Amino acid sequence: MNAIIEQARSLDGYQDSSELLQRRDQDWVLDRAGIEPRSLLDLGCGIGSLLLGAARRWPDLQRLWGIERSPLRLEQARAQLRGAGVEARLLEGDLLDLPPLAERFELISMTAVLHWLYPDEERLFRWAARHLEAQGVFLFTSHHPFAEDGLGGEDDLVAQALVEMGLAAPERVAALYAEAGLLPMGTRTRGREALRERVERHFRVDSIVSRPAALRVADSAEYQRFHAATFGTYFAPLVPATRLEECFVRLGRIAERRMQADGQVSEIPVSVWRCRAREGEA
């Protein structure tokens, strides 16, 4: 099996992927907390980078928890935190099917996860509101790529690859997604107003701060590893199995060309939301 396909199927290499996007936003997100929490729960904690950053920022943290669906990423998180001398309780769990916990937290965070919960984000919002201390803070990030014909963010690169591989004409790409039963990222990332409507059913939104997030890579190979670790085989239904490796190579070349032409692969607005539980929810 080709190494990049094996990586995509296992979602390995996230430690390198997070260096390109998530870690650079870590301080920006934690800056929005506005409190010095004694307890923190990170939802979709990945390899534990935000937990590690929080432990260093707030040395008086008494309870540090993380929940992650991927067993591989949980093991990597345990190793990273253990190596830094940080004690944390890490649980395996599906964010859309979490059991109730006895604990409540002063700070609950969730970064670079929301789009994977579509269209059931409210299940998580409801759960988070019920596990937040009365005066606690819920921080999460959302991405809002420009979406043409419903295709945005990573969809744009995938669409270009499909066209270059002769698998779809430009005007047929959206239809190809529909035929494959695959939701584009441009659909998974709700518009800010539509998202706010759902958030405000469970929280008071204190603030929303946004900035552009540019993806930059050194070369084609680095982009392929990023795509494999971040999206796995999500887009595989669009491509014949015998051409999946070719698709990764094509994506890498497109990313490299964009770097040469624009100095970046893509740019997507990202927002960090600071929320508090509504009365009766916490």
Regions found by a protein language model. Name each.
Residues A3-I4, D206-D262:
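C-terminal helical/coil "lid" or tail adjacent to the Rossmann-like core of SAM-dependent
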Residues A3-Q22:
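Class I SAM-dependent methyltransferase Rossmann-like catalytic core
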Residues L20-P37, G53:
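Conserved alpha-helix/loop element of class I SAM-dependent methyltransferases that forms part
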Residues L41, I47-D97:
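Class I SAM-dependent methyltransferase SAM/SAH-binding core
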Residues S109:
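A conserved beta-strand element that flanks and buttresses the S-adenosyl-L-methionine
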Residues A112-V113:
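Short catalytic micro-motifs in class I SAM-dependent methyltransferases
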Residues E122-A134:
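A short glycine-rich, Lys/Arg-flanked "PGG" loop and its adjoining helix->strand segment in the class I
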Residues L139-A214:
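Conserved catalytic/acceptor-binding region of the Class I
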